[in-house]
Amino acid sequence: MLSVNEALSYDKDAIGIGRKGTIDKPYILKAPFWTVDTLFYAIPREKVDLNFAFDIFQNIDWKKKDESTGVPSLSKTAINNIYVLAPKFEEQQVLGRFFSRIDNLITLHQRKQKQKSPPITASLVIYGSICFDCFMSVSNTS
């Protein structure tokens, strides 16, 4: 793929999933969106809620669908051979909104935690080094 001049979708959001490498990390593509040759995308059909479908994508063990010998890789055939049962559209919408809100809440709390927390790993390394140096000097004198 040398260049992309037009969006793949101007008005419908989709679910993106890596074709190579990060095959187990689906995410929502907001319209308009463009893609690259190492990404599959799925625009939900009528009567399929995007957030509900996204929840399904997140719960599929994509690594079991891996068709590679090196870098994790998916094919359209592997994706198209997945069948799931789904409730009525109205129920999908309720469930999709519910899980979307939970995902947003988790993300918000993770961001807050990162802002509040001092870099613990850096202080552990420093204290570990100090204690280790003291321990070594004690053991050398015995």
Model-derived features: positions:
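Feature detects amphipathic, helix-rich regulatory segments
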Residues: 1-142
